[in-house]
Amino acid sequence: VYREVFAILKANDEYEKLVFITGITKFTQISLFSALNNLTNISFLPEYATICGITEQEITSNFMPELQRMAEVNGWTGKETHDRLKEYYDGYHFSEDNMADVYNPYSLVNSLNQSRLRNYWASSGATTLLPKFIDDMEIHLADFEDCMIIRNVIGTSDVTAGGAELFLYQSGYLTIKSVEGNVYHLGFPNEEVRQALYECVLPALTLRKSGDIQSLQAQLYAHMDAGRLEDAMKVLKSLIADGPYS
């Protein structure tokens, strides 16, 4: 199906002024897409670093009424609302030469529309390739807060052969934090993504079904919010009781 679509695009290029294609991986080197071999990869170009998200300036210019409404609904100040949105949905960087912060547009728009902080991006559907890397994540989950990847690997077309770091970067779970020479430092862009990844791997870490974990999490949050520390510890012990020691 993809080959046919891209073959049509190439055959009719005289009628096309601009074509923008986005996804989680660069595919110009993959034989399946050889029918469309005249692409320009703009993934890391500084002039396009903010093309797929929402910037601080765009929030100020376009979303202040929605931000103010969200502040009123939740009893927050305007600054508190902005800071919470930034913590949850901001933090993406797409070019070492233009490290402008970019918000996840899907999550930000949904949050402002509903006046709630929720994991909107995660609930839109986790990638089916994620379980392939569960074993690596069990051992190195905390390392993804700050991990490194070589420059010529980060743009590799085969995400399944580049390790968990490459896949998590290209699928949006990690972003560029800084660059030193030929090494990219990657990390979680924001709180929404951090929580989403941890929830994805929690069933494997605890050897429990997702439904069981959600029930125990709800109990844990309720006890913590009410200050019932002993009850919270009982739930926590139950949650991790079957987990491996290593």
Please annotate each region the language model reported:
Residues V1-S246:
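Phosphate-binding site recognition
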